[in-house]
């Protein structure tokens, strides 16, 4: 008799054919909800359809089904992203001056859009240099393409087609994993496996393959481009990959192959994996050899991290154990119970991820200018300004989204009966202390930061410059920030003796880097003006946090409405006959938070735009004399409110206001139109629902009189719908106005 060890049971992780594919179902608007599927009685129907189409919680309470819908939707999202990327690459291939730009990136502007001559619109095709007429783009795609080693428009075509194939693949995957093989709930909740795959697969192998691409393709091609070789003469990527001798001519260590790696003689590879610091003086970007080295190191770290968590083999960390082992002196049972929250509430999980990703996006915004990663990015001022602004806005929206989903978690997924005395419960029990302290901090910051400006405006108006807070009178130097700058400027000598420069030129100490007579980067001086505006940043950020955090902590109950949880995430008032309870829902806090997020980000991008034009960007003469775009006026002008209005907003708006009849005229029209969109929002924000319902009823009366009344009854927007339309147009109008103002200005003077 043969004794066999018991066969390990294979877990079945998917359900086959759980939901049948039905085009009839898809074609029926509102098929996900019994009420909406009946069709419209009133115009409110179309709003409810939009509000609930993606609110999977409202379709079903089955967590597995919700998880599958979210998972499937992610593939749809990826499909759209690939489609968009394909379009970008196609524009580069078909409508751009990429090859011309590649041959002379300092004198030719990037353009990938040529306007057709319909009713005179061809005026928008400005001269970007090299005899090409088109719209100047500020997305940074040209710089990324050069860094990846793309040398021809044919390569862009091929990539665009590849992205289309991937878009189709993702669309198929979204259908397949919902209708054909849908994962079980246990699969979605297997966090250790998910961590291993995401860390080792996405981040580890992703970074490794990018490092490999850089070493074998980007570095040699960029080496040739920097030396002024014609792109058409440079060997193609596959020649570098297949022919080691080609690479060995540029990087001698390639001749030795993998021997140094296995004999641990790694320093041999220092010719293409460097640790220099600072910027490449030819391109004004980070050294690409530094970037390749960085991605290799990151890949190793994440490949190790992707083998740390316990899955099939019973070794490694369990996330639940790690969380529950965390106990501070004041936190009682510590993180006990958090694991269950994060594996059963996707809103809680999403909230954390949005907060982290939002913060990371803002970190990216600040690194794109201080450590410009791509060749010729630093001297393309329009792109620099656009990338900073874009990443700041995105980060702001993601962080507000984090608060929104935290509040939805509190209302829909939080179970107070099982959550006694865990960390979240302890936070909720002293929420009054948290919010009142935060409120005090906001009042303090608001009065003091604004007060410093008001003082300066008053002294300036009275003709008493010696009594102002400024670098030339009463100094308020940002000493801590200056200390951090100096520490980082001096750091390489002590901590990285092999590096030739510090991580960023902005820290100070180093010389400036100029490319083609334009400043790429130089040490950024900080003074009283920065100290003042920094405290406005502190103020606006704290108010945003106050509003959002109050919305989360009081989402389920408050002294005013103890049973708020029963009213849901969004409600206009606590019923008729209970005055003073309107606009207190968690949704309303997100609504208000969006306005303060807009304030906060606006001040940041204004600060950045003016500071860079005043103290960094400009031209360099043959003698090495730097002339900044606004001649260093930030330090003395931005210390009064009047200075911001006169020397920044008004002075720099001249380009967009006077753009008519030039290739920048579209920005003038957008500037005007976006102001209108913004003003349109006020109509929704300042007037009540009753006004519109009354107006509608008299219009309906006229229609009935003429016997042209529709079957669907018109209804005024609900209070919440009105506020949603209002905030959307407020933000859209404000952001588009700022975009037009920034770009018309920087394309004209940069």
UniProtKB/Swiss-Prot annotation:
InterPro entries the UniProt entry points to: PSI_PsaA (IPR006243), PSI_PsaA/B (IPR001280), PSI_PsaA/B_CS (IPR020586), PSI_PsaA/B_sf (IPR036408)
Pfam family of the protein (one): PsaA_PsaB
Positions that bind chlorophyll a: 683, 691
Sites where the protein binds phylloquinone: 692
Residues reported to bind chlorophyll a': 675
Any one Gene Ontology BP term: photosynthesis
Reactions accelerated catalytically: reduced [plastocyanin] + hnu + oxidized [2Fe-2S]-[ferredoxin] = oxidized [plastocyanin] + reduced [2Fe-2S]-[ferredoxin]
Keywords of this entry: 4Fe-4S, Chlorophyll, Chloroplast, Chromophore, Electron transport, Iron, Iron-sulfur, Magnesium, Membrane, Metal-binding, Oxidoreductase, Photosynthesis, Photosystem I, Plastid, Thylakoid, Transmembrane, Transmembrane helix, Transport
Transmembrane segments: 70-93, 156-179, 195-219, 291-309, 346-369, 385-411, 433-455, 531-549, 589-610, 664-686, 724-744
Enzyme Commission number: 1.97.1.12
Top-rank EC class of the record's enzyme: oxidoreductase
PROSITE patterns: PHOTOSYSTEM_I_PSAAB (PS00419)
Topology in the lipid bilayer: Multi-pass membrane protein
GO molecular function: 4 iron, 4 sulfur cluster binding; chlorophyll binding; electron transfer activity; magnesium ion binding; oxidoreductase activity
Location(s), subcellular: Plastid, Chloroplast thylakoid membrane
Residue sites binding [4Fe-4S] cluster per the record: 573, 582
Coiled-coil regions listed: none
Record's function text: PsaA and PsaB bind P700, the primary electron donor of photosystem I (PSI), as well as the electron acceptors A0, A1 and FX. PSI is a plastocyanin-ferredoxin oxidoreductase, converting photonic excitation into a charge separation, which transfers an electron from the donor P700 chlorophyll pair to the spectroscopically characterized acceptors A0, A1, FX, FA and FB in turn. Oxidized P700 is reduced on the lumenal side of the thylakoid membrane by plastocyanin.
UniProt xrefs under HAMAP family: PSI_PsaA
NCBIfam families per record: psaA
Subunit and interaction comment: The PsaA/B heterodimer binds the P700 chlorophyll special pair and subsequent electron acceptors. PSI consists of a core antenna complex that captures photons, and an electron transfer chain that converts photonic excitation into a charge separation. The eukaryotic PSI reaction center is composed of at least 11 subunits.
Family from the record: Belongs to the PsaA/PsaB family.
Protein name: Photosystem I P700 chlorophyll a apoprotein A1
């Amino acid at each position: 008799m043969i004794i066999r060890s018991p066969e390990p049971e294979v877990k079945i992780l998917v359900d086959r054919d759980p939901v049948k594919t039905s085009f009839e179902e898809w074609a029926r608007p509102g098929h996900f909800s019994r009420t909406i599927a009946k069709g419209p009685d009133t115009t409110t129907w179309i709003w409810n359809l939009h509000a609930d189409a993606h609110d999977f919680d409202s379709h079903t309470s089955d967590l597995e089904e919700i998880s599958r819908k979210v998972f499937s939707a992610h593939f749809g999202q990826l499909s759209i992203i690939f489609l968009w990327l394909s379009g970008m690459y196609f524009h580069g291939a078909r409508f751009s001056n990429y090859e011309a730009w590649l041959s002379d990136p300092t004198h030719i502007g990037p353009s990938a859009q040529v306007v057709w001559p319909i009713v005179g619109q061809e005026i928008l095709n400005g001269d970007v240099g090299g005899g090409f007429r088109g719209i100047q783009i500020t997305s940074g795609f040209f710089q990324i393409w050069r860094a990846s080693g793309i040398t021809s428009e044919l390569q862009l075509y091929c990539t665009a087609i590849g992205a289309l194939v991937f878009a189709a693949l993702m669309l198929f995957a979204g259908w397949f994993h919902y209708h054909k093989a849908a994962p079980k709930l246990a699969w979605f909740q297997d966090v250790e496996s998910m961590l291993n795959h995401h860390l080792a697969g996405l981040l580890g192998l992703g970074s490794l393959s990018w490092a490999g691409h850089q070493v074998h393709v980007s570095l040699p091609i960029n080496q040739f481009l920097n030396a002024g070789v014609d792109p058409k003469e440079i060997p193609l990527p596959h020649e570098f990959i297949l022919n080691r001798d080609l690479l060995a001519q540029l990087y001698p260590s390639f001749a030795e192959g993998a021997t140094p790696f296995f004999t641990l003689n790694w320093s041999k590879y220092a010719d293409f994996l460097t640790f220099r610091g600072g910027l490449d003086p030819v391109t004004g970007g980070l050294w690409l050899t530094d970037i390749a080295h960085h991605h290799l190191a990151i890949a190793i770290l994440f490949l190790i991290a992707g083998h740390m968590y316990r899955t099939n083999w019973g070794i490694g960390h369990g996330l639940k154990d790690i969380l529950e082992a965390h106990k501070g002196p004041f936190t009682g049972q510590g993180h006990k119970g958090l694991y269950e929250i994060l594996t059963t509430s996707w809103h809680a999980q999403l909230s954390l991820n949005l907060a982290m990703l939002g913060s990371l996006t803002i970190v990216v915004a600040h690194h794109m200018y201080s450590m410009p990663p791509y060749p010729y990015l630093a001297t393309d001022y329009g792109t620099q300004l656009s990338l900073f602004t874009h990443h700041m806005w995105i980060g702001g929206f993601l962080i507000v989204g984090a608060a929104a989903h935290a509040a939805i978690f509190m209302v829909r997924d939080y179970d107070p009966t099982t959550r006694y005395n865990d960390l979240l419960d302890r936070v909720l029990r002293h929420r009054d202390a948290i919010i009142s302290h935060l409120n005090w901090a906001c009042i303090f910051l608001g009065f003091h930061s604004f007060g410093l400006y008001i003082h300066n405006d008053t002294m300036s108006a009275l003709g008493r410059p010696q009594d102002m807070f400024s670098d030339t009178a009463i100094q308020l130097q940002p000493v801590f920030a200056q200390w951090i700058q100096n520490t980082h400027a001096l750091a390489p000598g002590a901590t990285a003796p092999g590096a030739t420069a510090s991580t960023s030129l902005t820290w100070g100490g180093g010389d400036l880097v100029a490319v083609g007579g334009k400043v790429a980067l130089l040490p950024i001086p900080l003074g009283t003006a920065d100290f003042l505006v920094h405290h406005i940043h502190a103020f606006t950020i704290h108010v945003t946090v106050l509003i959002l955090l109050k919305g989360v902590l009081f989402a389920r109950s408050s002294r005013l409405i103890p049973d708020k949880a029963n009213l849901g995430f969004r409600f206009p008032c606590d019923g008729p006959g209970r005055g003073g309870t309107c606009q207190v829902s968690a949704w309303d806090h997100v609504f208000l938070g969006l306005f303060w997020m807009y304030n906060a980000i606006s001040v940041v991008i204004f600060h950045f735009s003016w500071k860079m034009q005043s103290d960094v960007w400009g031209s360099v003469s043959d003698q090495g004399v730097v002339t900044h775009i606004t001649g260093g006026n930030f330090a003395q002008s931005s210390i009064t409110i009047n200075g911001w209005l006169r020397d920044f907003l008004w002075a720099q708006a001249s380009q967009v206001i006077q753009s008519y009849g030039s290739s920048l005229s579209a920005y003038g029209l957008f500037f005007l139109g976006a102001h209108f969109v913004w003003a349109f929002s006020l109509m929704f924000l300042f007037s009540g629902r009753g006004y519109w319902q009354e107006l509608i009823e008299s219009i309906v009366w006229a229609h009935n009189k003429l016997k042209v009344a529709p079957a669907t009854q018109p209804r005024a927007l609900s209070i919440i719908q009105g506020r949603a339309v209002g905030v959307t147009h407020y933000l859209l109008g404000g952001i588009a106005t700022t975009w037009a103002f920034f770009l018309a200005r920087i394309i004209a003077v940069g």
